[in-house]
UniProtKB/Swiss-Prot annotation:
This is Type II restriction enzyme HincII. It is an enzyme of class 3 (hydrolase). GO terms for molecular function: DNA binding; type II site-specific deoxyribonuclease activity. One of its GO terms (biological process) is DNA restriction-modification system. It catalyses: Endonucleolytic cleavage of DNA to give specific double-stranded fragments with terminal 5'-phosphates. InterPro entries: DNA_rep_MutH/T2_RE_sf (IPR037057), Restrct_endonuc-II-like (IPR011335), Restrct_endonuc_II_HincII (IPR015307). It holds the Pfam family Endonuc-HincII. Keywords: Endonuclease, Hydrolase, Nuclease, Restriction system. Its EC number is 3.1.21.4. The keyword Glycosyltransferase does not apply.
Length: 258
């Protein structure tokens, strides 16, 4: 289930032609270039799905403020009622322990989702990715392959297959003078991709990388089948990586230390 998908064409219409100033620092494919477009998406969702839409840190602040009698990280963690969502959305023990009205959470770049939509105990985690179509570039980091493997394991262990989606909105833009102009968008659902086709860049902190526009959406199995298929893919890739690392970085030097 996606709250975004039914209104995607409206989002697309709003974004196409939108201009934002190019960043004063960083690359045109970096976080600074994509953030203004993410803010436009958030603004649209907040105006049209106001009761559902949060930044991840806003949701955590709201959850804890609605439960003022719950204190301490262990008690606050139980508010999630889901080990998988706890893993994906929570902050660390110390930060959760020390949270208060005077010490609210703030946005972190490594939050799992740019935007969180919540209704009837279902969560849609949305990441907004920007693509510079002016030149060919490496696909962006999407999510840690290890983090996704941990997520899949928790889904299977706790039989939590219908609580959340992880989806992506790509904003394709090009440079026009001092502006970045949106020329097209794409929307894709992670759990509709073919798990065995996800590219893991082990040299880039084990990040899964893809352009949203290019992500296959043909997977028709259950969520449990997706999770198991991804774990098989991850383990196979990790084993191959381990063999490669040993062959390259261990075997040539082992004779010097024996």
């Amino acid at each position: 289930m996606s709250f975004i998908k039914p209104i995607y064409q409206d989002i697309n219409s709003i974004l196409i032609g939108q201009k934002v100033k190019r960043p004063k620092s960083g690359t045109l494919s970096g976080h600074a270039a994509g953030e203004p477009f993410e803010k436009l998406v958030y603004k649209f969702l907040k105006e049209n799905l106001s009761d559902l839409t949060f930044k991840q840190y806003e949701y955590l602040n709201d959850l804890f403020m609605k439960n003022p009698a719950i204190i301490g990280h262990e008690a606050r963690y139980k508010l999630f009622n889901s080990p998988t969502l706890l893993f994906l959305l929570s902050r660390g023990k110390a930060a959760t322990e020390n949270w208060s009205i005077e010490n609210l959470f703030e946005e972190k770049q490594n939050d799992t989702a740019d935007i969180l939509l919540v209704k009837d105990q279902f969560y849609e985690l949305l990441d907004v990715k920007r693509r510079n179509i002016s030149k060919s570039a490496q696909a962006p980091n999407i999510i840690s392959a290890y983090k996704l493997a941990q997520t899949c394991a928790k889904m299977i262990d706790n039989k939590e297959f219908d609580l959340f989606d992880i989806n992506y909105l790509e904003v394709d833009s090009e440079l026009n003078g001092e502006d970045l102009v949106c020329v097209s968008t794409s929307f894709a659902e992670l759990f509709k991709s073919e798990p065995s086709e996800l590219y893991i860049n082990w040299a880039a902190a084990m990040q899964i990388q893809f352009h949203v526009r290019d992500l296959d959406q043909g997977f028709n199995g259950t969520r449990e089948e997706w999770a198991k298929s991804y774990l098989k893919h991850f383990v196979t890739q990790a084993e191959q990586r381990a063999i490669s690392m040993i062959d390259k970085f261990v075997k040539p030097f082992k004779k010097y230390i024996l």
